[in-house]
């Protein structure tokens, strides 16, 4: 039995669909049973300070923990209460219930851009200054301690920026902007990315013991290995022919306007667009290999193979 949290989120919903299609024994944990009629469901709220009910983890062979707060401007206390404390409570309950394997979906933002490897344990990196990344870093460290002296295996997965035919967050904003804007973005910034379908395949492989800690890989940097700058991303997301490439000065000015319209700190949009978050070629991972690239994400309604 696989226990999945965050089944209504961007990654969790796709993972749930894949597991159901494969007829894998599945239990969902969440705050609401809405749209969960076809699956076993147990009420669970990460913000509850009490220990999870025993029924949550009964007969579970693997926990895949996708739930959490990801909003950029959530409060520091919410990040701490849900992403760190809630995750640790669930992990301790899994250990107490004798669950063999715990898979934690973290974030590549845990890794500094100048790190030599993106697959070191969190303790080898400085704590990030950004609140969301810091909460993931803190959760990773706490989980490592939680699973240090017992038989439950821990797999930490750090995905790059996740995409699919259906986009979310900043990629969705960029796609909407490019529907009417006639120019590509300049070649600034670098990103590691991963198709949602590939991430789902990796999570399924981990749950089945074919990848992750069961094969000796406790921390996985999950990317397709490609280096995506803003120009490449904007070209891939464009559905109309562009006239050329936007000058950097114009792009910077547009970012200032966006900061003002959305109430962001001055310079936030430009920093997000121009910063480097590329972590090198895709690592060799047992039982999994990425198949998709951003440029062909809309072919047949989703990402296509390289």
Predicted stretch roles:
Residues 89-131:
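Conserved Rossmann-fold NAD(P)-dependent oxidoreductase catalytic core, especially the SDR/UDP-sugar
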Residues 249-288:
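A hydrophobic C-terminal alpha-helical subdomain
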Residues 2-22:
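N-terminal Rossmann NAD(P)H-binding glycine-rich loop of SDR-like oxidoreductase domains
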Residues 175-198, 202-206, 221:
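A conserved pocket-lining segment of Rossmann-fold NAD(P)-dependent short-chain dehydrogenase/reductase
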Residues 127-155:
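Active-site Tyr-X1-5-Lys
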